[in-house]
């Protein structure tokens, strides 16, 4: 319930901010979605508004990602290690961050029985790496080291920003085309001659939901490609055998509890599925990831 409530509040805050921005664009700069006669669409104005909504939402979410991640998982940032395991975790993150030439991320632990970890943050030098208690308790040090390397690779590769940009582009076109569909239905089916009637808003919302679901296939495809690169980065930092062993340990685990959907793309242990469900998965199947490492695909020099 806390996770759902926090998610709704975050989205409400984003909508309020975007609403103010759009009001300024329309009232001060004269940006509009209809032509001066109020009959046809002003495609330039519509595209500007769609871009503001699409990229605005993505970048606000990115800017708040560390705060949201900590609240959603209840992660505790390690200010001063309380145990040998915490000291090892901080030292390992620091060592890999130096090797990759990035700033020292915040290191956190969150209480969860599943073996998982995630990385997030708006910039490579201002990021967060969080590890579950289940991972620290269930994995060997070699396996855990590989997982940490995987998360550091996400940061080093700039995956958070990359996926934010992709999501922004996708969002822009979803909003743009959903409004065009809404306008068409309002004019052709409901015969609204000037301005926009209720059918425009209802149809636009419905079209945005449908197009958003379809567009998520594109975002998830990119996410899966970045996951292969993060595995390769983890192999480079910790060793290929350790990375393979970590993925095989995840494969053997059962009844895994997943991270919140908003964080899953940057975890180590992604969602599972088969058939068409794989189109909407943020992570490739573990068998494919293991095979890619064994074959040396995606490995960096």
UniProtKB/Swiss-Prot annotation:
Q: Where in the cell is it found?
A: Cell inner membrane
One GO process term, biological-process aspect: proteolysis
The molecular function terms in GO held by this entry are: metalloendopeptidase activity; zinc ion binding
Show the GO cellular component annotation of the record: plasma membrane
> What does UniProt list as catalytic?
151
Its keywords, alphabetically, are:
Cell inner membrane, Cell membrane, Hydrolase, Membrane, Metal-binding, Metalloprotease, Protease, Transmembrane, Transmembrane helix, Zinc
Lineage: superkingdom: Bacteria
Any Pfam family the entry gives? Peptidase_M48
Q: Which residues cross the membrane?
A: 4-24, 44-64, 165-185, 201-221
The enzyme class is hydrolase
CC cofactor note: Binds 1 zinc ion per subunit.
As for membrane topology, the entry says: Multi-pass membrane protein
Write the Enzyme Commission number(s) for this entry.
3.4.24.-
Cofactor field: Zn(2+)
Question: Which annotated residues bind Zn(2+)?
Answer: 150, 154, 227
The record's comment on protein family reads:
Belongs to the peptidase M48B family.
Q: Which PANTHER family match?
A: PROTEASE HTPX
Full protein name: Protease HtpX
**What is the organism field in this record?**
Alkalilimnicola ehrlichii (strain ATCC BAA-1101 / DSM 17681 / MLHE-1)
| Originating gene | htpX
């Amino acid at each position: 319930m806390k996770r759902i409530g926090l998610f709704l509040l975050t989205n409400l805050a984003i909508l309020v901010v975007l609403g103010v921005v759009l009001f300024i664009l329309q009232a001060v700069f004269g940006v509009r979605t209809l032509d001066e006669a109020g009959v046809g669409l002003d495609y330039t104005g519509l595209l500007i508004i769609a871009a503001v909504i699409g990229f605005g939402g993505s970048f606000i979410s990115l800017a708040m990602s560390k705060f949201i991640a900590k609240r959603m998982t209840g992660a505790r940032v390690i200010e001063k290690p309380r145990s040998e395991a915490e000291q090892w975790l901080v030292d390992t993150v620091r060592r890999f961050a130096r090797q990759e030439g990035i700033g020292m991320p915040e290191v956190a632990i969150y209480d969860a029985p599943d073996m998982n970890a995630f990385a997030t943050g708006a910039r490579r030098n201002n990021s967060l790496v969080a590890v579950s208690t289940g991972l620290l308790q269930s994995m060997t040090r070699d396996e855990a080291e590989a997982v940490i390397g995987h998360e550091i690779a996400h940061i080093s590769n700039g995956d958070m920003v990359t996926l934010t940009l992709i999501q922004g582009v996708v969002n822009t076109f979803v909003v743009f085309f959903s409004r065009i569909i809404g306008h068409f239905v309002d004019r052709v089916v409901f015969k609204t001659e000037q301005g926009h009637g209720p059918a425009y808003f209802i149809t636009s919302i419905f079209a945005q939901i449908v197009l958003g679901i379809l567009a998520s296939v594109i975002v998830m495809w990119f996410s899966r490609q970045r996951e292969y690169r993060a595995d390769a980065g983890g192999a480079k930092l910790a060793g290929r055998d350790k990375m393979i062993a970590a993925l095989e340990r995840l494969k053997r685990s059962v009844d895994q509890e997943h991270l919140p959907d908003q964080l899953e793309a940057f975890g180590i242990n992604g969602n599972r599925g088969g058939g068409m469900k794989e189109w909407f998965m943020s992570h490739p199947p573990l068998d494919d990831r293991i095979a890619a490492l064994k074959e040396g695909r995606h490995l960096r020099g």
